[in-house]
Curated annotation (Swiss-Prot):
Belongs to the bacterial ribosomal protein bL32 family. It is found in: Plastid, Chloroplast. One of its GO terms (cellular component) is chloroplast. The lineage of its organism: Eukaryota, Viridiplantae, Streptophyta, Embryophyta, Tracheophyta. InterPro entries: Ribosomal_bL32, Ribosomal_bL32_plant/cyanobact. Keywords: Chloroplast, Plastid, Ribonucleoprotein, Ribosomal protein. It comes from the Eukaryota. It comes from Eucalyptus globulus subsp. globulus (Tasmanian blue gum). GO terms for molecular function: structural constituent of ribosome. One of its GO terms (biological process) is translation. This is Large ribosomal subunit protein bL32c.
């Protein structure tokens, strides 16, 4: 006989959502930092040609 599943609690949903948000925030911060270093020319990990 089929039994309905228990619904996920609101606190558990919130915790999972916050974990996902933290991952996204860190990735965005890293991308922004890389973009800043490329624009100023201080990047040591990327070789990019500058157009003058």
């Amino acid at each position: 006989m089929a039994v309905p599943k228990k619904s996920t609690s609101i606190s558990k949903k919130r915790i999972r959502k916050n974990i996902w948000k933290k991952k996204v925030y860190r990735a965005a911060l890293k991308a922004f930092s890389l973009a800043k270093s490329l624009s100023t020319g201080n990047s040591k990990s990327f070789f990019c040609t500058t157009i003058k």
